[in-house]
A protein has these predicted regions:
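Surface-exposed, charge/polar-rich loops and edge strands
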Residues: 1-351
Length: 351
């Protein structure tokens, strides 16, 4: 990606890629901050008035439509057992937050990639926006086989009308589909800023909000894929015997297909057994996308796999009720190139 971008203007200059976390973070974050201030000073960014961005992204699974808007971090929680209008969908690991919090500290801008689900079976919000004559902001092919993306500006009055259609009954109203640690880091940063503010400054401070893409869970392009478990550096026969003593399975070579419920319950049971075996016998656990890839890697020496079923999207919101977090790696929304690219940004400080 760096070779492709070279010296061209790119949001790559404003982000800390996950692949680089833990590698010279301070130097990278300082460079990101400098790039942001330079872009602001040189008028390299197009500033919009208040509103939303309506996006249409074409990938191999179809066309995904989303609404890019600022969410109120006061309404968000990742704490277990805490009900909130905006919920994390999996447990947040504190150690993974530090570099992301540091990235936001003293930064004038954010360029997030988080996707949040909402529920709208009739797709009223998207259908309303499709009927409008909106100003087109961008329309181009994405790099690295990411498909095509188009964005339109939704002015403030229409944005307010659209927002009313996004609120389904019951909590959570929104749940993080991708970017759990990014949203949690934004909340942690806001809490540190909030502690320094006067009461009258709390309601509208830019750090209180975070930009995210809101996607209808019932969009036809939203597909939940399972994430399989791969055991490495283990006695494959011993692992298979151990797992099959605890769960009824079909066995295909060194791949086990357990008779467990799809989704959180099956993942939790699988993880408990895999972690117990590794704790008692050594080895490591890896996460693999695709049944064929799992079979290929499980056939390698000292490896074994557990093939899981895909979570039903209808079970997603009910599983989070009451502040419950899903086990890590419960589902995937597809390959890396199908995830959200970094496009829109927002000011998060008054500097």
């Amino acid at each position: 990606v760096e070779r492709s971008v070279a010296d061209a203007p790119s949001t790559l200059n404003f982000i800390l890629p996950e692949a680089f976390l833990g590698e010279e973070d301070e130097e990278r974050i300082a460079a990101i901050r400098e790039n942001m201030y330079a872009a602001l000073e040189n008028d390299a960014l197009s500033k919009l008035t208040r509103g939303f961005v309506f996006t249409e992204r074409t990938t191999r699974t179809g066309t995904r439509r989303g609404i890019v808007a600022a969410i109120d971090l006061e309404a968000y929680s990742s704490e277990a057992g805490v009900s909130a209008p905006i919920r994390s969908s999996e447990e947040v690991v504190p150690e993974r937050l530090a570099p992301r919090i540091a990235e936001r500290k003293n930064a004038p801008l954010e360029f997030p990639h988080a996707i949040l689900f909402y529920r709208d079976k009739k797709d009223r919000a998207v259908k309303m926006l499709l009927r409008e004559e909106l100003e087109k902001l961008y329309d181009f092919d994405l790099m690295e086989g990411g498909g095509h993306v188009t964005g339109w500006f939704v002015p403030e009055d229409l944005a307010a009308e659209t927002a009313q259609l996004l609120h389904a009954k019951g909590e959570p109203v929104f749940a993080v589909a991708d970017g759990n640690h990014s949203v949690a880091a934004a909340k942690a940063h806001w809490e540190s800023v909030r502690a320094t503010l006067k009461k009258e400054e709390l309601a509208n401070h830019p750090a209180r909000f975070m930009l995210a893409e809101l996607v209808n869970l019932y969009d036809a392009s939203v597909v939940f894929y399972p994430i399989h478990r791969l055991l490495k550096e283990v006695d494959a026969e011993a692992f298979c015997d151990f797992f099959m003593k605890n769960v009824r399975c079909r066995r295909e070579g060194t791949v086990l297909i357990p008779s467990l419920p799809a989704g959180a319950e099956g993942v939790k049971k699988t993880d408990e057994l895999c972690e117990r075996f590794v704790r008692e016998n050594g080895g490591t656990i890896d996460y693999v996308h695709g049944a064929k890839e799992l079979a290929r890697r499980a056939a390698e020496e000292d490896c074994a796999g557990v093939q899981l079923a895909a979570m039903d999207k209808e079970d997603f919101f009910p599983a989070l009720k009451g502040g419950v977090n899903l086990p890590k790696k419960t589902f995937s929304l597809g390959e890396a190139k199908e995830k959200r690219y970094y496009l829109e940004g927002r000011e998060i400080s008054y500097d």
